[in-house]
Every structure is written in structure tokens, then in C-alpha cells.
Amino acid sequence: MALWGGRFSQAADTRFKQFNDSLRIDYRLAEQDIVGSIAWSKALLSVGVITELEQQKLELALNELKLEVMEDPEQILLSDAEDIHSWVETQLIGKVGDLGKKLHTGRSRNDQVATDLKLWCRQQGHQLLRTLDQLLNQLVNVASEHQATVLPGYTHLQRAQPVTFAHWCLAYVEMIERDYSRLEDAINRLDTCPLGSGALAGTAYPMDREKLARNLGFQRATRNSLDSVSDRDHVMELMSIASISMLHLSRLAEDMIFYNSGESNFIELADTVTSGSSLMPQKKNPDALELIRGKCGRVYGAMAGMMMTVKALPLAYNKDMQEDKEGLFDALDSWSDCIEMAALCFEGIKINGERTLEAAKQGYANSTELADYLVAKGIPFREAHHIVGVAVVGAIEKGCALEELSLAELKAFSEVIEDDVYEILTIESCLAKRCALGGVAPEQVAYAVEQAGKRLQERDNAGVKVRPARLTDLDALEGMVAYWAGLGENLPRNRNELVRDIGSFAVAEHHGEVTGCASLYVYDSGLAEIRSLGVEAGWQSQGQGKAIVQHLVEKAREMAIKKVFVLTRVPEFFMKQDFIPTSRSLLPEKVLKDCDQCPRQHACDEVALEVNLQEQVIIKSSVA
């Protein structure tokens, strides 16, 4: 079903339709389109376009459709709809009839697709942050294990000075951390909601766009409707960040390909990331790394194509902008795959420490040490540089290393050279002298490894925050509540109940992933109950449950609620947060009635605890 047919007296040519349709690309925005539509239905309710009953029917049908899409997203491609917006609307009308035709009131596909795309970019951006962290952890772990593994450092692909394998890993840690920082900044910049901007001049309905933005999890609404539908900066910025990061990954891959070669033999990749030759049975090819290097150009091409597409577009939506998604999807998919594969290449990697040490001793990599030695003896550096160059030529002619020349032979190049020269020509001395911050001295490398690990841990800890639940959290909430209900720890809640009570829930979020939840159910008597508290497996004992409870108690205090209570089998947890035991008989009748849903109702072992918020206020006032 086309969304624009009334103006036309002839059907579109099938060739034009095929050329014009974008469903095969933008079907990936199905969940975002549905979530945006649910939020829009609430906005329409707020301005009286639809009734509360109509909004509930729309929301229920859209949630059903979302579940169907999650179970089988490929079903969308069987349709001949023009785009994902047409498909969602057609499916909705099929579920609720003409009511579905009301949903697009006051909305344009221009602000609709802009919102869908930002929702997708935000979600994908958070996932990419997690993937980058996985690679960083791998690099730091390998660095920690190989702080003492000497590696030749290169300039112009010629041996220059000795470093360590840890130092090499940490160089890429710095690069990938810059990628992480750029991506964080970009996610923050794109976190504005275009919905309600209409085609270009804004919606004609007086809805609260800031509230609409918050319902979709955005920081705020966009400030200019014309810019809102014209803006694709976030697409280009993400592709630019992906391109820079792919450059780093390509350099990483190139280094490792060289280190893995028979000529170097510094490392051996695991069989799991290599392949063989169809002709030469001895081959073990670093295909994973070569593909990372190869896909770099693919991401660059997508970015360049997008910039060329928008460089001369007039403001507001133009059909050219339909081309934004294919390149974006492919670029971010490729980037994500390459980050994951780079991390995988460090699993099972073997470093040939004997070979790297042997290589580091070759190529006169200690020449700079001899020059510094002469400087310490009072010879100007430029003159010392020349003397050492002549000495290297002499060693090459003799076929030996600098440290293998006799003292008499060394004195022939400079009389100031004494027996103590041999100590400074060792690999250990070469490394130890580079003791300034960022150098290869053992203490500096150890410090860098420690600091990198701390940064990762701090970021991991800081990534957890508690906030009010949103419609976009519904799937995570449903799964978590069902998990704990299945264990008999919480009461079961169906999806419709969760949708209805979404405003009572708070969630713990770790880098965009919901990891814990609970709700605050308010009774008429000025009491409130903490329900459905649960934390994802793997995230327990990390303070998330405590943070959620504190958030809900503070919310209750702001609402002037007198007491908050809980029924629990782990009273110790709540007592650490100022809850005290109370009698179940003092609880409202409705609480005990809700227990009818509990599978343990006839053998209840839950303890009732409460926190008196009024008493806390009195105590604080007295202390003050």
C-alpha cells in the first residue's frame, strides 16, 4: 500500500516502483519504527486526536507486531510495500482496521525516518562501544602477559630500536581508546529527537515534544524542524569514526600479518582464524587479518559515497537521502565484524619470545645507545651520530654486532670509549633507559598496563546507571521478569501489564544494555511496594540491585509517600538499606490478594520489611 496515492491518476510503472522502493534495505528499522509509532500514539492521545481506548488498542497491536518482527524479521521482505513505514502501517491496519489509519496524523515520513534512524544509530553505537571494549580487554590482557617479551621496533620497516610486545599492544590500546571516545561523543550528539518536526515546518498539533523525546529515551527534542528532517550529520559522523577506526584495525592487521610471516616468525595465529591453500598443503594463511585490512576500503567508500550524496542537497528531505542507509548499515556492520575478528585473533595467539629477542638484537638497534654514551662522555650529539655511523659500517664489514667489536676496535672510532660501553649496549639497558612516561622501560610498561586496566574497569563501573524505564526497554523487562518469575522469586507479569505499568519501573543500564529492573507500586493508603526486583545473571553482586532500590526509595520520597515495603526471601539485602522487619498483617489487603498469583502462596517464606520515609525526614531535620 502506497502512502501517497490520492494525487495520482496512474499507477507507478513497475520498473519505477522497483527503483523507488527501499524495503529491502530499511526493513532493519522495523523495531525502531514500531517503537516510534507507540510513542507517537501516546502523543496523539495527549492532544485529543485519539481516545485512551484507541491508544491502548494501537499500542497492543504494535507490540504484537514487534514480537512478530523479532521472531522472524525476514518475513518483511516477502511484502511489496514501498518501505518499512508503509509495511508497518499496512500490518497495523490489518490488526486494528481503520483505527490504524489515524496513527500517521500530524506525522510525516520525513520526521519518522529521521527518528527511526537515530534510534537505530544510538542502539548500534552502544553495541559498538561494547565491542570495542572487548578488543581493548584482549589487548590489555596480552600486554599484561608479555611485558618482558622483547620485540624489534621498526621505522621504514627496518629494525630501529627494541621495544616490548606489551608496548606494541598498548600503542593500539591508545588508538582504539580514541575511537571509543569519538564514538561516545557522536552518540551524545545524535541523542536528540526529530519526531514532531513534520515534513519540514513542524507538526500542527500542540504536543509536548520534550516529553515525546524522553519517552523514546532521547536527551531532548531537536530545536529546528527544518534542520531535523535535513540532518544526516550523525550518519556521516558514525561512518567517519568507523573509517578512522578501520584505519587503526588495518594497521594492526598489517603488523600482525608481518609478524606472522615466515620471514619474521614472531607470532603464530590460532587455527581458528586462519585457512589453508587449495594447492599448497603447507600453507596457513592469516585470512582474518587480511580481510580486516581489505574491508577498510569498503568502509571508506561508504563514507565518501554518503558525503557526495548530501554535499549539494537543498534543505528538507530529498529522495537522495534514501541512499543513507545502505552504506551506513554496511559500514557499521563491517566495522563491528572487524573489531570482533581482531579480538578473536588475539585468542590463542602464540608469541615466539626467543625469535623476537633474536630479531631485536639484529640490525644494530643499539646504535642510538652508543651515540648517547658518547654524548655522556662530552661529545656533541651530531658528532657522536657520525662516529657511530662509521662504527656500524666497520661492524658490518666485519660481519658482527657492535657489542661484538673489541674495545680496541671501538676505541679506533673514539678514544673516549671504555669498558663500561658493553653494559649500555645490552637489550636490557636499551629498554631501561627509556624511563620517561610512555617509554619502554619495564616500570613504564607496567604502569601503562595497570592504568589501561584501571580505565577499562572504571568505564565498566561507570557504564552502570539507573533510570526510569522506557518503552524501548520492554523486551528486556519482559525477559527479566519472566526469568525470575520462573524461578519463583517474583510474581509473573505479562507484556500487557508491563506496558501498562512501564512508568512504575526503573532499570539499571550498562552501556545501553538493561541489566536489572524493579517497579514501585503505589497504593491508595500512602504506601508503596517495591516489586519485580531482578538483576541479569552475571551482573549480580555488583551493586545494581542496591542502586535500583535506592532510586525507587528516592522516587517515593519525592512523591511524599510515607512508607515503602517489600516482600522478600533475602531480608538481609534490604536491611542493609535501612529496611526493617514488619508484620505481614499490617500490609494492605490488596497486597495479600496479589499473592494469589504466587506459586508459593500456600507455603510462603517471604519476609515483610519496610522503610519509614517520614521518620527519616524527622531524623534528618533533628540532626540539622
Swiss-Prot record:
Region described as Argininosuccinate lyase: 1-466
Keyword tags: Acyltransferase, Amino-acid biosynthesis, Arginine biosynthesis, Cytoplasm, Lyase, Multifunctional enzyme, Transferase
Region of interest (Probable acetyltransferase), ranges: 467-624
Subcellular location: Cytoplasm
Taxonomy, superkingdom: Bacteria
Family the entry assigns: In the N-terminal section; belongs to the lyase 1 family. Argininosuccinate lyase subfamily.
Record-given protein name: Bifunctional protein ArgH
Organism annotation: Aliivibrio fischeri (strain ATCC 700601 / ES114)
Gene assigned in the entry: argH
